[in-house]
Amino acid sequence: MAGIGVKLNNIYGKNTLTTDVIGMGYSTVMTIAPMLTVIGALCIMEYFLDFSSVGYVTRELFSCTVLYIFIFALLTASPFNSVLSKYMSDVIYEETYADIMACYYVGLFLNILLSSLVGIPFCIHEYLVGKVDIIYVFTGYCGFIALVFVFYSMLYLSICKDYKKISFFFIIGMTVTVLLSFWFVRGLHKSITYSMLLALTIGFWLIAALEFSVVRSYFRENSGNYRAVFGYFKEYWPLVTTNFLYTLGLYIHNFVFWTTDLRMIVVRSFVCVQPYDMATCLAMFTNISASVIFISRVEMHFHERYKAYSEAVIGGRGCDIEITKKRMFRMLAEELMSLARVQFIITLVIFLFCMIFLPRLGFGGMTMRIYPCLTAGYFILFLMYAEIIFLYYFNDLKGSVMTALSFCLSTMIGSIISTHFSEIWYGIGLVVGCFVGWSVAYARIRNMEKNLDIHIFCNGHLLKRTKGTCPSPKVFDRYQGDTEERMKES
């Protein structure tokens, strides 16, 4: 995010309302440009291919297929990405770049394996129980795997800071998708929904191929050191847990409402609650720019203070360590407050825009009644995510797991309770869950501030840990001379 960070800091550095709005637009577009491209392609296909003329069940089958492809592609990728990012950061620091492709192939294998374990049983159920045509089912599965591939390769392009290429590849892929869908319907006279699904699948595979080609162009050598990657999963399992619980928490409130009487079941396989799911999508888009704003500002500001503190720990005086520590935590507090201030302006502007114009575009009723509460929830959620990033900086993996677990469980319990409330309070479960997670993370950061010296200087071990019999505590015998263990060491 360094390139984006420089641009954003030039914008926000003027500290005016106008520049905040400009920064809002820039960060939002850079963050969700790929998603906007996909949504735009779907809207174009639905409008020009007369999607509304298709039967209701067929339309809902297509909509639910696309919804499930996106949600579960994110969920199945979440356990691996954080550990792989950690491994690649260490590899880049050590300048052993040949290990990156080994990491890429291991991560890709794990992603595809988990996605297949989730997707294949569902597809079998969809075919046998839902009586959906097997070609349609297989095409949907291919689209799911392709999107998993796309999301996974985006991780490596982000490390290479090729954010513009990611957006460019999505534009190419979705342009091909739209053109192919027209050809399938007008030229080959295929059904509208299957043509759209097939074209979307081909578009995803094209994006995945383009991303893979760029990754291969950057990292041509493969060390074959696959075992080291698996070792990281064993050592940094808290990262796996944190990322999975955080991603699950993003959608667990949807899953709770999918069990209520509001749910709609399509072909005895897909479950959804359209008004709530749409409100969730709008609320997430309203606040998603917070992530890129925060990460870019951390790289440009807090990271420098963190680096100065680390250098003081390595070779500075006691007073230098104390001064740099205070400056670092002062910057941490400033960044959290700045994020809250800027994101509040962004959220408020987008929220007012949605409340005024979306009803004119057909969004209304229950969706717009649920939307405000969910917007507040996602506002707190991205502030909580910022705190998790800070916990990563201080290697507080236990705190990050506690934060993600409390967030996920509180959101689930709160959502179960909120199903008995009126529509306007349906999103209160997410608000409560995010606030609980934010509070846990804040408490861990304050505890880290008070006990940072203990965390830094008292977590090492004077003796190397090994497995085996415990050596004799006797290091010297005045009557026998050196002990047997000392003689072996010498």
Give the positions of each predicted feature.
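Small-residue-rich midsections of specific transmembrane alpha-helices
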Residues: E60-S89, T247, Y251, T280-R305
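N-terminal membrane topogenesis motif
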Residues: M1-L42, E60-C64, F230-L239, I456-S490
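Hydrophobic alpha-helical transmembrane segments
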Residues: F169-R216, I424-N447
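Transmembrane helical elements of multi-pass membrane transporters/channels
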Residues: A199-G203, I207-E299
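Alpha-helical transmembrane segments of multi-pass membrane proteins
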Residues: L67-F72, F109-L113, P121-Y156, I345-I350, ...
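Hydrophobic faces of transmembrane alpha-helices in multi-pass small-molecule transporters and flippases
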Residues: D20-I32, L36, S167, N225-I252, ...
